[in-house]
Amino acid sequence: MLEKSGSVAETFGIPLAVLLELTHRCPLQCPYCSNPLELERGGAELSTDEWKRVLSELARIGVLQVHFSGGEPTARKDLVELVRHATEVGLYTNLITSAVLLSRERLAALADAGLAHVQISFQGSEATIADRVGGFAGGHAKKLDVARWTRELDLPLTVNAVMHRQNLHLLPDIIELALALDADRLEVANVQYYGWALKNRAALMPTLAQIEDCTATVEAARERLKGQLAIDYVIPDYYAARPKKCMGGWGRQFFNISPSGKVLPCHAAETITGLDFPSVRNGASIAEIWRSAEAFNRYRGTGWMQQPCASCAFKEIDFGGCRCQAFALAGDAAATDPACALSPLHDRIFKTAEAEAASGSDRFLYRNFAGGTVEGA
């Protein structure tokens, strides 16, 4: 049992699924990249043996699923070995990939090693827009090939479509693409604006009319395709009246491990300054980090909350919303998430969204290890 100062004692069981960011290396240059602003270099990454130790410990403490992610996880030459080890210790394995580095032979080797599921990101339904958004020529065609190979190998497939102002008009076609690829699930995820995406907000922010059309399209498709294609949907917080229950609440249902072994309450947590995130390299067990690390306990439960969250009837439903967004927009990770109508900043961010959506700006600051490249510069 974990004692949280300022609140009742609560029990936080080990999450059933964990995200493993094997590397921050990636051939794509997406303008909404969710990796931290300070990317971890290849030389800092956990070794094969270190990742195997992590996988064994995760299985031992009760984790059931691991999601191999990045960056681009297929940039790791030892990925097949890691998938095989995860399978041997009893973990369900999911690969979250841009797919552009995969050959059919390597995908088959991953399947033989026990890979259970593949999730491929798509930047659009056709190559011109998709390749421009990802900053990678030929990427869309390669993704289509890998998606087909995935189904030929009898692996379940999820299509992950990251949506924004410059591709939302393609949503009906993306739904049809997911069907044509025989995907089991489609994730329609509007960009969330922190980290690198915040730098490109003016080029990415959709209009409210676009979001309303998007929502109607998703709802109609869910009804039409019930039992055929599962569709998950996330809207941009700037147009919401209530904050999302981010990651199920800070330190309640989720953690991920960075390429260098840092254990994080969410993949964007490093955007919050002043928090120290323990590493699996420093000798502490993952279970002990989950239970006792100050970074996890800082915003766990409700005892940390300021007003109006502290007296809100929804505080144990949304747990104050997103801490990373509160820090990015309010400068205080303990502040009310500005996505909430009770935040004094709510009207301001709504107006910001409307203004930037109407700005006409469409040039991207691409994400890469050089720090960023302006489109067309």
UniProtKB/Swiss-Prot annotation:
Keywords, comma-separated and alphabetical: 4Fe-4S, Iron, Iron-sulfur, Metal-binding, Oxidoreductase, PQQ biosynthesis, S-adenosyl-L-methionine
Catalytic activity entry: [PQQ precursor protein] + S-adenosyl-L-methionine = E-Y cross-linked-[PQQ precursor protein] + 5'-deoxyadenosine + L-methionine + H(+)
Residue stretches making up the Radical SAM core domain: 12-228
InterPro entries in the cross-refs: 4Fe4S-binding_SPASM_dom, Aldolase_TIM, Elp3/MiaA/NifB-like_rSAM, MoaA_NifB_PqqE_Fe-S-bd_CS, PQQ_synth_PqqE_bac, PqqE-like, Radical_SAM_PqqE_MftC-like, rSAM
Transmembrane segments: none
Entry's Gene Ontology BP terms: pyrroloquinoline quinone biosynthetic process
Molecular function terms from GO: 4 iron, 4 sulfur cluster binding; cyclase activity; iron ion binding; oxidoreductase activity; S-adenosyl-L-methionine binding
EC number annotated for this UniProt entry: 1.21.98.4
Biological pathway: Cofactor biosynthesis; pyrroloquinoline quinone biosynthesis
SUPFAM superfamilies: Radical SAM enzymes
CC cofactor note: Binds 1 [4Fe-4S] cluster. The cluster is coordinated with 3 cysteines and an exchangeable S-adenosyl-L-methionine.
Cofactor(s), names only, from the UniProt record: [4Fe-4S] cluster
Matches recorded under SMART domains: Elp3 (SM00729)
Residues annotated to bind [4Fe-4S] cluster: C26, C30, C33
Quaternary structure note: Interacts with PqqD. The interaction is necessary for activity of PqqE.
Family of this protein: Belongs to the radical SAM superfamily. PqqE family.
Role this protein plays: Catalyzes the cross-linking of a glutamate residue and a tyrosine residue in the PqqA protein as part of the biosynthesis of pyrroloquinoline quinone (PQQ).
Record protein name field: PqqA peptide cyclase
Organism: Rhodopseudomonas palustris (strain ATCC BAA-98 / CGA009)
Encoding gene, per UniProt annotation: pqqE
